Amino acid sequence: MSSSPDIAGILDNTKELDRLRKEQEEVLVEINKMHKKLQATPEIVEKPGDISLSKLKNLYIQAKELSESEVTVSNILLTQLDSLLPSGPTGQQRRKLEGNEQKRKRMKVDTDVTRVSPSMRNQIEAYASLKGEQVAARVTAEDAEKDEWFVVKVIHFDRETKEVEVLDEEPGDDEEGGGQRTYKLSMSCILPFPKRNDPSSTQEFIPGKHVLAVYPGTTALYKATVISTPRKRKSDEYLLEFDDDEEDGALPQRTVPFHKVVALPEGHRQ
């Protein structure tokens, strides 16, 4: 009879877990709606009084808080369940557990993926699909004075650690050894390029927008300002002005293919 309160507590927490997950789903639906709206009409954020970005930020904060609450309640449930289970498995249970050890190891990654939110699962699948593709990667440390971004090739994505292993196929002359170099980076250090063969589905950056783009003739990306868009130019290239690219007292305008231009990361240091 003494376990009844524990059972009641477990049931209460499972209900709370269901509620949190339903709320997360609702918030993620709203986030996806905002993403589609901004992709379809990116110029809306330039209008005075528009609060789209502020609303999106608040939705992300709400999603983060719900996710953290889900983790907290899940941990409480684990503790409650542990207190009701026998202190150790029987001999038969132990043999079964040991026999399943390898199976558990194989299933661990898939289990971890099912614990994360739907949006994170989608993000993980998206990054896993990048193997063999070129992406933009920040290879400098978080506390570095300047951010350095290069074109690299994805060679592996670890679903468990959420790390992306990339290959710098054309390191600069000042790199030690001068050969190809690999990096293991977090997902936040990777920016996928637009699909070269599908320009119609690519977000177009409006004139005046700051972007990160591959400097012509190099594999390095730098901050630039959009002067003209591919649609306006009736081509597959942006016309850009790169920061710190001054020649004869003026910034030259350079063309860059749309599939080598990405959104400027927040807090970019150059």
From Swiss-Prot:
Database matches in Gene3D superfamilies: 2.30.30.140
Compartment list: Nucleus
Tissue-specific expression: Expressed in roots, rosette leaves, cauline leaves, stems and flowers.
GO CC list: nucleus; SAGA complex
One example of a Gene Ontology biological process annotation: chromatin organization
InterPro entries on file: SGF29 (IPR037802), SGF29_tudor-like_dom (IPR010750), Tudor_SGF29_rpt1 (IPR047288), Tudor_SGF29_rpt2 (IPR047287)
Basic and acidic residues bias locations: 95-113
Protein's UniProt name: SAGA-associated factor 29 homolog A
